[in-house]
A protein has these predicted regions:
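A metal-dependent hydrolase metal-coordination microenvironment
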Residues: 22-198, 206, 214-231
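Bacterial N-terminal signal peptides that target proteins for export
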Residues: 1-7
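Hydrophobic h-region of N-terminal signal peptides that target proteins for export
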Residues: 10-19
Length: 233
């Protein structure tokens, strides 16, 4: 398992005039994390796994951050640890991996999206999209909204309630899309995480049509319970 949080989405890109035989399905992941936030592997290693396992698209959506700028981390004291670094170095080599020891501390630089995208994307078969998990909350309830193909990082917007918090974050995404012309879309992640979001909260939203039905993290409660609907319902 590449990260603690794994979502696999498959969808068909087909016009309404196409027959069922003409429909083509594309498989990808829009919600996964790297060492840029709380994931346990390097972005290139994550992209390499998906590319090598028949996926067509990937968006690494770290919490409230884009993979840009200088970011050096402790080589051993991170979620992946020395084992992840050893695999990373073996796969990509010293010519690619930036690492050094500063005052006795082993450090490694996380590659930016602008650096790893040209190396890992394959035109026509494997698409990489810059993404962010906009991670907000209301009174301790986690409200996380994925933004796929984002252009500029968006900070959490806050709000006066669960639905209001979601709406303000969605509005920020839609405003960026309109201002930049960049194709992008938001979707609600793991609504049952922390029992934070009710169906009535999502029904009220404007400009939002998608939510995450399945998430592989053990705490997201995909299947609900006696008092809460499953995400499939």
């Amino acid at each position: 398992m590449i990260t603690k949080t794994l979502l696999t989405i498959a969808f068909a890109l087909a016009a309404t005039t196409l027959s069922a035989e003409d429909t083509r399905w594309w498989k990808g992941n829009l919600h996964t994390h790297s060492l840029w936030s709380d994931g346990d592997d390097y972005p290139e290693m994550i992209a390499d796994w998906y590319r090598s396992n028949g996926y067509h698209f990937l968006g690494i959506s770290d919490h409230n951050v884009l993979a840009e700028g200088q970011r050096w981390i402790h080589r051993e004291k991170n979620a992946g640890g020395q084992r992840a670094f050893d695999k990373y170095l073996k796969r990509f080599g010293d010519d690619w991996v930036d690492h050094k020891v500063v005052k006795g501390v082993p450090r490694v630089r996380l590659k930016t999206y602008a650096e790893y995208r040209p190396k890992m994307a394959v035109p026509g078969s494997f698409l990489l999209m810059q993404s962010e998990e906009l991670s907000d909350q209301f009174q301790g309830r986690p409200i996380h909204i994925n933004v796929t193909n984002i252009k500029k990082q968006i900070p959490p917007q806050g709000g006066a309630g669960v639905a209001a918090t979601m709406q303000k974050n969605i509005d920020a995404v839609l405003a960026q899309r309109k201002a930049t012309g960049q194709p992008m879309f938001p979707h609600i992640n793991h609504p049952n995480f922390g029992w934070a979001i009710q169906p009535a909260d999502m029904i009220r939203l404007r400009g939002e049509r998608f939510f995450e039905v399945y998430n592989g993290h053990p705490a997201v409660r995909n299947y609900g319970d006696s008092k809460h609907l499953s995400t499939g319902q």
